[in-house]
Amino acid sequence: MNATKFVVLLVIGILCAIVTARQVKDLSTETKLGASLPKTTTKGIGAQLSATGTTYSTSSVVSYANGFNNPKGPGANSFESANTFTSGQVTAKGRKARVSSTSASAAEGDAAAAVTRKAAAARANGKVASASRVKGSSEKKKGKGKKD
């Protein structure tokens, strides 16, 4: 190893040692999270009014049936699978913010197959249903002197 390579590696090693030897400063929770929650007032200036609702619903059914007769003899197979998934999220801020979120899924399926030496029959059925509903409002402060 020549002298130039040795000096370069030595300098890199010293810089790495300096960087790793620094102490980590304590950070506030606000800085660590990278976000701060805004303060709201109840007098109207700076008050936050929002209502958010999301919902997702999905259903799936796979039904498969097979009946066959081949030289080795009759055979049959069937397969059925049903999946449902629902999720919802509700966010409400400020005065009188209301949100409701409902989600429902249903999946049903059946499959059957039968064979004899002379005939083969197969049947497959599937039903799915999904429903989602989101309702939300964020009422503003009523004006003085007005009655509803």
Curated annotation (Swiss-Prot):
Q: Which domain of life is it from?
A: Eukaryota
- Is Electron transport among the key words of this record? no
Q: Where is the composition biased (Low complexity)?
A: 123-132
Entry annotated with the keyword Signal = yes
Q: Which residues form a coiled coil?
A: none
Q: Which portions of the sequence form the region Disordered? A: 123-148
What are the alphabetically sorted keywords of the record? Signal
The similarity comment for this entry is:
Belongs to the UPF0540 family.
Protein name as annotated = UPF0540 protein At1g62000
